[in-house]
């Protein structure tokens, strides 16, 4: 047994048990989604950096969300594409651990950034006269750094608990990428502590922040209903709707996967939920956040020269 434990240093990702034609179709489709993700989020970052009118707390946090989405995609999609072209090409032990760590880091950071964005929206709508005094750049930077730091630290805990585990079972991960629960199934030691820490991290990183978001939106809704101007009300509702769509996509899939009974789903269903979470969410987030935002759309028109053409 000891020899087996030390010999397994490479692993195969077997998330796509399909024929060659379907593999090539998925390769083209996922490549397209990957390009759209990079272009969409990259466009948001470019517009925010180019237009001084977008140098506000709301867009500062949106730029961090775009960075997380780009990082999400870059951590998982390239490896998926490699697996589709070369199913027998293994991933190293170090590569597996790094992918698991980064996925967890970006997931936690994204959840916390959405909480921060909810707080920013709460201050903007419920305390508009004090907004600039409350949301100073020092506060914004502190909130963003705290989100990233918390994501890294919580993921380090999982990594520290994962590294000592012996892996003596067949080195086949039946998943699209090295998700922590899929990796734990390969361990030939007791993983109850690891699984309990994943559940505890999911509850603290999902249910707690989501409760904060719900409270914030209850206050926001009360404040919006008291606004006299119908036009201002509609603009506030549009902003809230876009943000809530992103929250629903991110938190909805994550809670179903990690917090429900036995992590919420049969193995295959959970695997495809994770695919949606890591592939489609980063692509959809910039569209949802920006296409309904008039300031971002106007900046894009100016950059593309649409206004001059009209």
Curated annotation (Swiss-Prot):
Keywords, alphabetical: Cell membrane, G-protein coupled receptor, Glycoprotein, Membrane, Olfaction, Receptor, Sensory transduction, Transducer, Transmembrane, Transmembrane helix
Keyword Transmembrane helix set for record: yes
Segments on the Extracellular side according to the record's topology features: 1-24, 79-99, 158-194, 259-271
Predominant location category: membrane
Disulfide bonds: none
Pfam families assigned: 7tm_4
Transmembrane residue ranges: 25-48, 57-78, 100-119, 139-157, 195-218, 236-258, 272-291
GO molecular function term, any single one: G protein-coupled receptor activity
Glycosylation sites noted in the Swiss-Prot or TrEMBL record: 4
Lineage: superkingdom: Eukaryota
GO biological process: detection of chemical stimulus involved in sensory perception of smell; positive regulation of cytokinesis; regulation of actin cytoskeleton organization
Membrane topology: Multi-pass membrane protein
Location(s), subcellular: Cell membrane
InterPro entries documented for this protein: GPCR_Rhodpsn (IPR000276), GPCR_Rhodpsn_7TM (IPR017452), Olfact_rcpt (IPR000725)
Protein family (similarity comment): Belongs to the G-protein coupled receptor 1 family.
Protein's recorded name: Olfactory receptor 2A4
Organism: Homo sapiens (Human)
Upper lineage: Eukaryota, Metazoa, Chordata, Craniata, Vertebrata
